[in-house]
């Protein structure tokens, strides 16, 4: 019997390394997006494994941020330093033992509980070529939004601690599907 091979990687999108939140969003969603920062269109037309892409907003976020280009261009505009950290990128693998029909509800629940409920915006995409590597990409704003839809200052490690300061465990979301 094969053993599940978990993969969960968190990185920061950094302008100082030539990275772009708009490019990351274009890559994971398969959409053609124009970057106002460098005046270039970002498009990765070789991405054939896209299953689903969605943006999850907190209730008080401006509705215009449901548009991927608007959201990530706004993020890049507010992060205006040459060495700005633009977004948090998470890539996580789905265990192949979990039925594909559960991927969407699992990732939405995870994003809602861990990020959107804390005021962050989550842009996620599920990829699956059908070759045993189903995974999700999540692009997160580093700043949460206040109740008026304005960006708050960045908060360190908001993604890995719950309201009691305890470490968040992914098993809470995935465990029922694995049993």
Residue ranges and their predicted role:
Residues 1-179:
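N-terminal nicking endonuclease/strand-transfer module with a His-rich metal-binding environment
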């Amino acid at each position: 019997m094969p053993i599940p091979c978990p993969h969960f990687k968190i990185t920061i999108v950094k302008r100082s390394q030539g990275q772009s939140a708009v490019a990351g969003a274009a890559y994971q969603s398969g959409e053609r997006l124009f970057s106002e920062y460098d005046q270039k269109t970002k498009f990765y037309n070789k991405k054939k494994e896209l299953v689903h892409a969605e943006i999850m907003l907190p209730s008080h976020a401006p509705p215009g941020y449901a548009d991927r280009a608007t959201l990530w261009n706004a993020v890049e505009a507010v992060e205006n330093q040459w060495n700005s950290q633009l977004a948090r990128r998470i890539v996580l693998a789905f265990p192949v033992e979990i039925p594909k029909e559960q991927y969407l509800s699992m990732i939405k629940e995870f994003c809602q509980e861990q990020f959107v409920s804390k005021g962050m915006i989550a842009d996620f995409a599920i990829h699956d070529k059908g070759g045993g590597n189903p995974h999700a990409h999540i692009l997160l704003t580093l700043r949460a939004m206040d109740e008026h839809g304005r960006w708050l200052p960045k908060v360190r490690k908001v993604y890995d601690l719950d309201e009691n300061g305890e470490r968040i465990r992914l098993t809470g979301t995935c465990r029922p599907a694995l049993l």
